[in-house]
Amino acid sequence: MRLAASIAVALPVIGAASAQGFPPPVTGVTVVKSKYDENVKITYKENDICETTEGVRSFTGHVHLPPDNDYFGVYQNYSINTFFWFFEAREDPKNAPLSIWLNGGPGSSSMIGLFQENGPCWINDDSKSTTNNSFSWNNRVNMLYIDQPNQVGFSYDELTNITYSTINDTISVADFSSGVPAQNLSTLVGTGSSQKPWATANNTVNAARSIWHFAQVWFQEFPEHKPNNNKISIWTESYGGRYGPSFASYFQEQNEKIKNHTITKEGEMHILNLDTLGVINGCIDLMFQAESYAEFPYNNTYGITAYTKEKRDAIIRDIHRPDGCFDKLAKCREAAKEGDPHFYSNNATVNAICAEANSDCDKYLMEPFQEANLGYYDIAHPLQDPFPPPFFKGFLSQSSVLSDMGSPVNFSHYSQAVGKSFHGVGDYARPDVRGFTGDIAYLLESGVKVALVYGDRDYICNWLGGEQVSLGLNYTGTEAFRKAGYADVKVNSSYVGGLVRQHGNFSFTRVFEAGHEVPGYQPETSLKIFERIMFNKDIATGELDIAQKQDYGTTGTESTFQVKNEIPPSPEPTCYLLSADGTCTPEQLNAIENGTAVVENYIIKSPAASKGNPPPTTTSSPTASPTAGSAMLKAPVAMLAISALTVLAFYL
């Protein structure tokens, strides 16, 4: 084994994105005990790890909820220690609104959004230093990044010794009573969560119940946030297409119960004044979005053809056949309505029916796309995709960073326990009580702004499906929204960043030249859209006050499909040790496993990878690469024993 001098041989790296050895002892944290419950507390630490703007404060910490409670309406017998990272606004934080940011998964850390998309800093390719992000979303808004549900990212239930395989991207519980095992590039050690699938929320609605309790504690008792503006927004991404509508509608329902005195328990009566729900490339409802998985790989604005028209037509037929995807989704939803109406996922029969529906839909929707060897999150990129750069994983591996954060656990970008728990009950196949599109309609009727924002190169939660969701809502503004045309999103005097359909508080935006993580591709465009929505301006120009003009509607074309895009150059390949399964070739994976890889700052320098083939178009043939594809897919699928759709679709 050869390691570059920049990585100490004695300090391994850990986690599905994680840390150099065990975390250092936690010191210097402030402890705030709840005035409502002696068993609840907040621990936190102020630091300048990412936000280095003079005078702008940031804090990392945990909200600790004890076991033996019925927070979810079902007995919860595990500790919940939910991690947060709070950044004050760079401009007038006392009067700035606040937005929560949640990545999806289920099981993905919100550090993905913070460091790859919209946080105050970018991580440089040395995985050690940072560069200021001038398009950070905390320019004018207080930002609260949360790792949820329990066991995601820096959140944990109980501190547990673990090993991590960089080859398979898997975490295993370890017994170190006889000593810590030898470590190398492929096998690392650290401290994580218990990895018990039952020690976390097991579905979207239970996650909503959990995050509401977190919010009750944080917004009432975190002493460093005392704003004059008490409005709260939720922005989210990917599987957040389910999180966002469910969480926001649950918050709104709880607000109503507090107002009518249905909720009277001390410490749980803080009204969370919802302002905006923003969803970026959200997978919201498979009933609305399923056909887009067949259509988008063949028919998109880049001229990329992952497969033929005949294959597309066959997929459509398969999902509509008797006892196919749509039939099984309908059966799942009917069973859930009868057997688990409040979405606790405690009915084994319902869980099995919905898990089968999820698996069947995957078979016909996802598997044909795998053969094209294209990026799930960017169809113009190869399957082994180095963008957005994964350097934050090495950054969060540093002992000094973990110490400054006050974290007792190593970082992991994805929780296997959460993935297993959600997928085992068929979460993606079923809606919540109102339905996720119904949740959006409910929020709009309640006066909450809702923005759907989609990058136009993402396959996994693509904009064609997102547009169908936007047109399928049933609320009082439905017809007016559908009649609104698409207008240019004017980012600056020389650049149009996308097209938006907007009526009043509801909008759908297609962002040009962006994959799944839109702010990582188009930071200026994303910031403009975010701030215009947050401050009640029209998305197209940012000049009109929507609060004073609630009947505002965009004018323009009925469709955006006439606006075509050029295929960008493929990114230079970068095999990154802490993202090996998604960025490295089979040859590089073998070198990591046998210890012959040359590594510098987590980047495999040798063996080097060659640039992949350009994506197939209408004038070329698909270039399938089953070997490379299997290198990406084998670990998560084998590890979770679940469908490729549920593993890959929502890693972010």
Swiss-Prot record:
InterPro entries found in the cross-reference section: AB_hydrolase_fold (IPR029058), Peptidase_S10 (IPR001563), Ser_caboxypep_ser_AS (IPR018202)
Domain of life of the organism encoding this protein: Eukaryota
Disulfide bonds: C50-C121, C325-C361, C332-C354
Residue positions the entry lists as glycosylated: N77, N132, N161, N168, N184, N202, N260, N299, N347, N410, N474, N492, N505, N594
Membrane topology designation: Lipid-anchor; GPI-anchor
Family: Belongs to the peptidase S10 family.
Protein name per its UniProtKB record: Carboxypeptidase S1 homolog A
Subcellular location: Cell membrane
Organism placement in taxonomy: Eukaryota, Fungi, Dikarya, Ascomycota, Pezizomycotina
Residues that, per the record, bind substrate: C461, E517
Gene source species: Trichophyton verrucosum (strain HKI 0517)
